[in-house]
């Protein structure tokens, strides 16, 4: 089993981090991305406050996932997840609550939105890079899975539209918390690459309770989360190259949406 896990991790690392990283690098050069950098007063102190806020939000997310797991334990899971406006609104409100420690800390520290990657800086370039990455990943997965075009066409319905909005809410919320808030502060404190690696690992492992809520065993959930690290790294690298959460946010949305179409 572990041989398969290591092999899959290697394939994902090659696909996302080597090939994907090279694509992001050259797209940033071609589009002439402008780099402003991020400056925080007292980087160590700011990073520690960011860690505390993100830890609180992560604990809240974990608690919600555990409750969801307990609630679903006595129910027969549907093979097809349905989405609608109510689910999207509920997701948005839930994430607003889950992000409250980060938003409150940001307010207390008087940090601007720009210091979390939320600005019009490299706006068009970020949208384009995020869309290109998302489309390439979507096409690659479709080809690899051998799913017929007719099946995908059939799945492009109203449910898929609401699913896209729902994944956009979750994707951008996660990117704001981990990439825009935590990663930027860690980069300012411990350096660009260390900040990227630490944030990517933390974000990937945060999905363990989510996977368990979906019915995986603890061992399966850990393996699934570890296999998310390459994807997490490329999203973090995309944030570094664009300095805007739009690019990783769009990519994240498409990546999560793929399964709805297959």
Q: Residue locations for each model-derived region?
A:
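Transmembrane helix-loop-helix hairpins at the membrane interface
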Residues: 1-6, 10-26, 137-262
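Alpha-helical transmembrane segments of MFS and MFS-like solute carriers/permeases
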Residues: 49-57, 128-133, 165-166, 183, ...
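N-terminal, membrane-interfacial amphipathic/helix-forming hydrophobic leader that caps
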Residues: 1-110
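Juxtamembrane helix-loop-helix connectors linking adjacent transmembrane helices
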Residues: 66-95, 100-171, 213, 220
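Membrane-interface helix-boundary motifs at transmembrane edges
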Residues: 33-45, 113-122, 183-190
């Amino acid at each position: 089993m572990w041989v398969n896990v290591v092999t899959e991790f290697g394939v994902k690392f090659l696909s996302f981090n080597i090939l994907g990283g090279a694509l992001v690098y050259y797209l940033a050069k071609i589009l002439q991305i402008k780099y402003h950098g991020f400056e925080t007063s007292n980087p160590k102190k700011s990073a520690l406050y960011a860690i505390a806020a993100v830890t609180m939000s992560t604990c809240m997310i974990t608690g919600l996932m555990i409750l969801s797991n307990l609630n679903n334990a006595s129910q027969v899971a549907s093979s097809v997840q349905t989405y609608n406006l109510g689910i999207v609104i509920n997701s948005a409100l839930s994430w607003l609550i889950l992000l409250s420690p980060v938003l409150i800390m940001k307010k207390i520290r008087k940090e601007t939105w720009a210091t979390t990657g939320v600005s019009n800086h490299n706006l068009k370039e970020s949208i384009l890079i995020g869309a290109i990455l998302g489309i390439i990943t979507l096409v690659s997965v479709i080809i690899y899975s051998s799913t017929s075009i007719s099946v995908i066409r059939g799945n492009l319905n109203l449910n898929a539209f609401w699913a896209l909005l729902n994944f956009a809410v979750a994707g951008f919320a996660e990117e704001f918390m981990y990439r825009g808030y935590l990663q930027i502060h860690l980069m300012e404190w411990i350096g660009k690459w260390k900040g990227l690696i630490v944030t990517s690992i933390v974000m990937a492992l945060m999905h363990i309770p989510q996977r368990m809520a979906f019915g995986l065993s603890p061992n399966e959930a850990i393996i699934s989360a570890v296999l998310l690290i390459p994807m997490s790294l490329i999203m973090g690298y995309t944030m570094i190259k664009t300095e805007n959460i739009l690019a990783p946010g769009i990519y994240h949305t498409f990546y999560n949406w793929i399964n709805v179409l297959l």
